[in-house]
């Protein structure tokens, strides 16, 4: 089931560290492409949808479209399966447009529980000491929840989660293993 809701705010826009906006869920940019909100208030609001209840809220993907065209999106995911995908409007061309942001954040992360495949750092994941993204501990935590089936910390063909596709004649000329993912160009395979 898909439901659309348009909660009203006192003001239009998204808060920043320098700007106060009185919006419905206290949606705030946290730097870079980060977004946060009053998550409890968001979940309480979602409980107003006809078939959503406390027993299935953690199986309900919530997509928020903040009233902003500042590019970026993020999907907050909780261990119980709950997810809120923040997908601001975008004026860029596909795949960076609004549709692409929704596909990536809501479809890829919130629904599919897939990990990011792009690269920020020219470093091995287990040697990187940056503070801007997750590393092996966070990666393994997500894997223990059954997430990130598109990523592995091994490049062994028979050990990756998609090995059945690599060795299937219908896909063997398309599916392979590539190094780089989860923001690191080494030590993560997609």
Question: Which role fits each region the language model picked out?
Answer:
Residues 1-121:
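Active-site-proximal segment of zinc-dependent metalloprotease catalytic domains
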């Amino acid at each position: 089931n898909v439901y659309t809701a348009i909660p009203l705010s006192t003001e239009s826009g998204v808060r920043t560290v320098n700007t106060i906006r009185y919006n419905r869920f206290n949606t705030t940019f946290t730097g870079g492409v980060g977004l946060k909100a009053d998550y409890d208030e968001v979940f309480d609001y979602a409980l107003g949808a006809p078939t959503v209840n406390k027993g299935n809220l953690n199986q309900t993907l919530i997509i928020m479209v903040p009233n902003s065209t500042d590019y970026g999106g993020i999907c907050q995911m909780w261990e119980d399966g709950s997810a809120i995908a923040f997908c601001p409007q975008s004026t860029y061309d596909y795949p960076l447009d609004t549709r692409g942001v929704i596909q990536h954040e809501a479809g890829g992360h919130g629904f599919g529980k897939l990990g990011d495949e792009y690269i920020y750092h020219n470093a091995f994941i287990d040697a990187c000491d940056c503070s801007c993204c997750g590393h092996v501990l966070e990666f393994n935590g997500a894997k223990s929840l059954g997430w990130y089936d598109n990523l592995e910390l091994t490049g062994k063909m028979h050990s990756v989660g998609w090995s059945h596709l690599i060795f299937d004649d219908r896909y063997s000329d398309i599916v392979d293993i590539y190094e780089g993912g989860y923001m690191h160009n080494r030590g993560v395979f997609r």
